[in-house]
Amino acid sequence: MDSVMIARRLGAGGLIAVAAVHVNWARGSAWPASDMQTLAQAVIGRNRMPGAVPCLSVSALLMLGALFVSGFPQHPPKLQRAGALGVVVTLALRGMIGASGRMPHDRASRTFAYWNRRLYSPLCIALAALCAAGLVLPGDETEFS
């Protein structure tokens, strides 16, 4: 397996894992927190979690992103590349803005700020890098040519 395929699979796998967590939250789970209020403070900086529809919407977008990044199923090459590039740009911007401490959450909890700096932003940057590597590393270019 070449480096391009490894990067694509790792990036897509990360997106799928995050999508699964959002589905879990849509079903009412407070994992990994002890209760919903603690979870909400940690993941969005508020006292209440969004409902199932917003959580499932985020999950669906993450899954779509994983399809673009993985190269499966085969989309028209320009659509595939544009979709994967959109994933990279979105994740990179989210990661950089979060890491800079300039997230537009003026009322966000300290718990969110803590986890945003230590987990969410670095995770977004790492996923962006993996997804970008799948676009730019030399390898089998047949999927995106």
Please name every model-derived segment.
Residues M1-S145:
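Short amphipathic, positively biased membrane-proximal segments
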